[in-house]
Amino acid sequence: MAGLKGKKVALNKGSNVHYLLVRALEEAGLSIRDITPVYLPPADGRAAFESRRVDAWVIWDPFQAAAEEQLRARTLRDGSGLVDNHQFYLASQTFAERHPGVIALLVEELKQVGSEVERDPRQAAEIIAPLIGLPADIAAKALGRQAFQTQFITPEVVEAQQRIADTFTDLKLIPKRLSIRDVVWTPPASAVAQSR
């Protein structure tokens, strides 16, 4: 990571990889000011990386797996032990408050599907490969690096998201401080019990 000092780095602004880059640079004794960020969506980031208009590209799977396999890109640092990466399913506050049982059923179904993917990632890769436009081996590589344990948002996840929000506020990506706890829906105990 120290070799990125003074280099152009493509990334999706305000994303999970933006936070990963900030933390990875800090770990190497650098800051975001030590590089030139080039804010691009994934497809444009790949094109810039492939054409060498940028020196590095910070991206998530399956784009990362595709770059590793198709472009022979080398991973400089992943988020292991550095950042918590979570993916979220969203509902409006009104829907969540009116239909917690439906959300509990959805969470239960997602858990079952996730267990199937973890049991047989190759089969899952064969199914999703044509949908994402990548070969099954690349989809399998990406799936193999992900966890599929869907759950309701825990206090630990709220804390991790608060750290990200605070960092983004410090970087002026978010105009004012916000409280993640205030915007996260907490299901009633009955919905949590139903999803177990």
PLM region descriptions:
Residues 13, 34, 58, 77, ...:
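A generic structural-conservation signal
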Residues 6, 69, 185:
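Phosphate-coordinating loops and pocket residues in cytosolic domains that bind phosphorylated ligands
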Residues 37-38, 43-130:
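Pocket-lining segment of extracytoplasmic ligand-binding domains
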Residues 26, 31-33, 74, 134-135, ...:
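Short coil/loop linkers at secondary-structure junctions
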Residues 1-66, 122, 158-163:
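Bilobed "Venus flytrap"/periplasmic-binding protein-like clamshell domains
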Residues 169-196:
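Conserved C-terminal helix/tail region of periplasmic/extracytoplasmic solute-binding proteins
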Residues 97-175:
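Secondary-structure end/capping motifs
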Residues 14, 42, 80-81, 185-188:
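Residues that form or immediately flank small-molecule/cofactor binding pockets and catalytic motifs
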